[in-house]
């Protein structure tokens, strides 16, 4: 088997949130034809129990504990040396020593980096083909954060956006290939760095459509007689927190005023204090961790994705579409998804439009045409098999000179 070094900023298992879904499917696919040497961080104590599962797919492995609080403090060193804070956040000398050992002792033919913060570990490598999966343009996400933050965080976020964009460009120039999660994201990066356009491509996230299938039987987790709106996601993630807080405060009251029996369920692990506080609002339920999100999707009346901060492709939207649910999404949540608006995916432009569309769909009953079309779109365009074939082609190319 050909040997490959794979560096990931977060352990690629379990595949229960956006980045881990993509990094896991990459690992699983790569392991079919490569001996994969994996270096990664673990930033959730609950994930240590999965290391044997991950090891079963790998050759050599290195798992490094990352305490988010301590890493944030350590990242401030970037302020003193003019670096994006992302780099010291993900810097670890033990991981660097392991990378050096693997590259010095194993016949590694390809290096795959998942997310920009991990590229620093192979910045001096020249004799091995290097590919980076940026996934999203993270620098733009930091700029989005800055628009809703007060001082001094808005200054820090703008600084991070500017410096990280410079680093993203540096990586794209130096590496042999770069990938993103959608054609939209790749095209935006083409505009930011035209000279590297020939090296930049994309492969879509996929959905396991057999797992997320409306044909399966699921227990109903909701009380009888209620109309349910549901949002799913990791509820300590800033973009998700912003989305549900905005929806709960700016959209949901208008819906409840018209339809008092409607309830809004926020489903996902580790709800932040701001999210947990929403449970005090009439008609809002915060579940915390659930072992299986599919029953919550299957029995919901509508799925909402009101993200105001977003890049790339939202897996939560694709999963709901695969379950034949009507998804009402913000423009940011819908960006990058190849779906016909109003026929496969419904887009709401602002809080008034969101409330109007939710009320209209709930009052007018079933729309099986939209539901079926949504799943067909996922089946046609969002399978892992189709997307990951592009990575195979990149790995088989000769190293750029």
Model-derived segments and spans:
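Donor nucleotide-sugar binding/catalytic pocket of nucleotide-sugar-dependent glycosyltransferases
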Residues: 63, 131-132, 139, 157-191, ...
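Conserved acidic donor-binding segment of nucleotide-sugar-dependent glycosyltransferases
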Residues: 345-352, 360-365
């Amino acid at each position: 088997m050909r040997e490959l070094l794979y560096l990931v900023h977060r352990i690629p298992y379990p595949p229960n949130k956006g980045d881990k879904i993509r990094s896991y499917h990459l690992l699983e696919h790569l392991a079919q034809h490569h001996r994969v040497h994996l270096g990664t961080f673990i930033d959730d104590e609950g994930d240590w129990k999965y290391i044997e599962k991950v090891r079963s797919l790998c050759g050599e492995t290195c798992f490094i504990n990352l305490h988010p609080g301590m890493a944030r403090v350590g990242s401030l060193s970037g302020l003193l040396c003019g670096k994006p804070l992302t780099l010291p956040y993900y810097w670890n000398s033990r991981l660097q020593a392991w990378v050096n050992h693997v590259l010095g002792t194993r016949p590694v033919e390809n290096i795959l980096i998942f997310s920009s913060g991990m590229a620093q570990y192979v910045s001096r490598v020249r004799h091995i083909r290097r590919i980076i999966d940026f996934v999203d343009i993270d620098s733009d996400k930091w700029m989005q954060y800055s628009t809703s933050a007060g001082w001094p965080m808005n200054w820090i976020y703008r600084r991070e956006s500017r410096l990280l964009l410079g680093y993203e460009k540096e990586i794209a120039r130096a590496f042999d290939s770069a990938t993103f999660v959608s054609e939209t994201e790749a095209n935006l990066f083409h505009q930011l760095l035209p000279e590297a356009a020939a090296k930049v491509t994309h492969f879509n996230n996929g959905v396991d459509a057999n797992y997320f299938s409306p044909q399966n039987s699921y227990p109903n987790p909701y009380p009888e007689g209620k109309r349910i709106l549901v949002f799913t996601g990791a509820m300590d993630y800033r973009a998700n927190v912003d989305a549900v807080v905005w929806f709960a405060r700016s959209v949901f009251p208008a819906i409840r005023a018209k339809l008092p029996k409607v309830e809004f369920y926020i489903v996902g692990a580790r709800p932040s204090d701001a999210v947990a506080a929403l449970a005090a609002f009439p008609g809002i339920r915060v579940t915390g961790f659930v072992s299986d999100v599919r029953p919550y999707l299957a029995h919901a009346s509508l799925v909402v994705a009101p993200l105001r901060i977003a890049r790339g492709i939202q897996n939560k939207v694709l999963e709901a579409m695969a379950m034949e649910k009507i998804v009402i999404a913000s423009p940011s949540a819908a960006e990058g998804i190849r779906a016909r608006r109003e026929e496969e995916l419904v887009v709401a432009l602002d809080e008034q439009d969101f409330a109007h569309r939710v009320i209209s769909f709930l009052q007018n009953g079933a729309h099986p045409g939209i539901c079926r079309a949504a799943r067909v779109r996922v089946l046609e365009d969002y399978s892992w098999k189709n997307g990951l074939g592009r990575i195979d082609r990149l790995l088989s190319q000769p190293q750029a000179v």
